[in-house]
Amino acid sequence: MINPIYLILADFFDRYIGEPPEKVHPVIFIGKLIIFFENVFKSTNSINKSRDLLFGFFNVILVLAIVFFMAYEIEQVINSISNSYIRISLYSIILSFSIGHKSLIEFSKAPIRYIVNNDIDGAKKSVQCVVSRNTSELGKKHILSASIESASENITDSIIAPLIYVAIFGLPGAFLYRAVNTFDAMIGYKSEKYLYYGKTAAYLDDILNFIPSRIAGMLLIITAPFYGGKIKSAFYGFFKEGNKTPSPNSGYTMATIANSLNMGLEKIGCYKLGKGEITIEKALNSLKAVDYSVLLFLIIYTVLLM
């Protein structure tokens, strides 16, 4: 288990400074690797189950091997630095590249700002950046819902899970997780093209998020009073509605926030979580939930290692 100061500083750097330029962003590099090997293995759009399953598996293995090697070597170089201030700072900065705390808040808050300014078209375009559904026909309620769903789901993907994996496995753990998560975002969805090619990525993402998503949900329950929610309602949402989404993991944080803040979240034709009106105040409180759950995680981790 690594020193808590690395996690605390990494989240601080990401939350208040933000991500590096795209040219040097590790996740962008991972995405380019995925595309490179996809072009090698899947040069045609024709569907062949056995071939696509096999080549999709090879794509995942090769990218993860490269990411592991690079992260491991970087970690070894950093750990060899004798000056503790430089070592801790550099490690934390590199680690912050695997976290998306600031971007999660900013992307989720953008549609809310458009709604406040009565710019529905701007809100539709903005929320399209954070969800895969068609937003052209969405009204105010469903735009706010999509924004809140994205924020609550990505508490796990963007922050809690990377912190958990770096805590246990160091930099390689954080960036291997980020690679799997990037795979899932790029080829893990059930389109015709990626139905079989993306299965390995999708299954691996589900496995790696199984425990972190439930930890994130419990953090949201405990911190409910701090973001304007209710512990009892959050508890109900986690245990009664957490399994109501197609994903085996994303529903736990979404249902917890929805019920805690007494609001209904809905992806039309797919799922409904919680009950109650979605207001601007509740939408903003759902973003506060992100900050408080991360803060509690860092406090608990620090106390456990004292």
UniProtKB/Swiss-Prot annotation:
InterPro entries: Cobalamin_biosynth_CobD/CbiB. Its main location: membrane. Keywords: Cell membrane, Cobalamin biosynthesis, Membrane, Transmembrane, Transmembrane helix. It comes from the Archaea. It is found in: Cell membrane. GO terms for biological process: cobalamin biosynthetic process. It is a multi-pass membrane protein. Belongs to the CobD/CbiB family. Converts cobyric acid to cobinamide by the addition of aminopropanol on the F carboxylic group. This is Probable cobalamin biosynthesis protein CobD. It comes from Methanococcus maripaludis (strain C5 / ATCC BAA-1333).
